[in-house]
From Swiss-Prot:
Taxonomic classification: Bacteria, Pseudomonadati, Chlorobiota, Chlorobiia, Chlorobiales
GO terms of molecular function: ATP binding; lysine-tRNA ligase activity; magnesium ion binding; tRNA binding
Gene field: lysS
Annotated organism of origin: Chlorobium chlorochromatii (strain CaD3)
EC number: 6.1.1.6
Protein name per the record: Lysine--tRNA ligase
Cofactor: how and how many bound: Binds 3 Mg(2+) ions per subunit.
Amino acid sequence: MQKNTSQPTNTNEQSNQPSLNDQIVRRIEERQHLIDSGINPYPCSFNVTHHSATILTEFQDEAKTPVAVAGRIMTIRKMGKASFFNVQDSAGRIQIYLKKDDVGEAAYNMFKLLDIGDIVGVTGYTFRTKTGEISIHAESLELLTKSLRPIPIAKEKEVDGEKVVFDAFSDKELRYRQRYVDLIVNPEVRETFIKRTAIVAAMRNFFARHGWLEVETPILQPIYGGAAARPFTTHHNALDMQLYLRIANELYLKRLIVGGFDGVFEFAKDFRNEGIDRFHNPEFTQVELYVAYKDYNWMMNLVEELIYTTAMEVNKSDTTTFLGHEISVKPPFRRLTISDAIAEYTDKDIRNKSEEELRNIAKELGLELDPKIGNGKIIDEIFGEFVEPKLIQPTFITDYPTEMSPLAKEHAAQPGIVERFELIVGGKEVCNSFSELNDPVIQRERLESQAKLRLRGDEEAMVVDEDFLRAIEYGMPPCAGLGVGIDRLVMLLTGQESIRDVIFFPHLKPE
């Protein structure tokens, strides 16, 4: 059995360890000693010719390939006239063999002042050690950065018959606050973020192959809209006006559809002044796509293709493990109306019910409701509490009540219902889509109804955006819209259980 602890449990061993401040002071003194010796501990550049992964994959025993690598010292064994150390670069780690007779006395003496965490440049040639490890025989060594703060390196010891890991950088809160250290010492964290970039690239290429245009829309907006959420506010001094950080980019993208583009998309940073938990960060990333002359049924098929294609390109597999469940993203996905889903999981029929009847249903289910919310929010609360967590395999939830979706087109055959779907995976929403409402008269009525909900105290109800209404009064073609939460999709495809594990620098409480 192996235990993991950030501090030694043996008090004698702990007392023999130099304090963090002592280690920093020693490194600062070493820095000054290097400077006094005529060595610049922070030179401008180094000519790198190879990365560790390339060397390890392309190594040939007899070649003695000349190489120049740079990286951070992660392990070090200082001996008499020859030493070994490992450097870590962006691609991995490789061992360096350093011999005094080869690099010279000055360079070897400098090496004796180096610590784990220092960044060095090495030139030499490749070889295989007697133990079979591919390594670099150093011919020159240059200090590139003197590290003044020691990085946490896991150390294993046997205590009372058990293997114990000391000094592991495993505290979640500390890892989020010091992501730069997390990336150094935890290779799997680096891989998650490399995969995040690959996911975004795969999606961008997917949209580009369809011929749709990538665009940019304002982050600072005079009126916020496109979602039910509370905004962050700021003030523009020169114009003396209040502005909002966008909660969604939907209304600006629709303006571009009015302007004549058949398909536009944007990878956007959005901001919502709401709570923080495993699935929510106030600043998050989503991609929104709008395609003219399409509807939500067409968009469901596209989403299946998008997620399957992205998973295969990035993971080379159509299955992933998420929140303890093995999930298949191979199409087709299940499709279920929100009314049928609630009926299936609660035995309650919500169709054609008044607000009072919906409140009674919620009460029967043991759900306490805010008295300020209306029918749509009540249904949303019931669905979120009793249905959504149970939808593990990819499921399209369709046909929402109009009040829940003021920007969506009414269903062609069902009054009071709109053509909308959400994709739920692992019990969480991953994307949202509409057949977009393009009747300006009905759109105005919907937004004015939202304004009345705001007067009742619903802070997330939408506001009336006169410029958006003016835009669609010029005529917006039939259109399907889609919003995909990038952070949650990355969680799904990398198997992470917290949004903080897929955002480099998540928001945290003050230290």
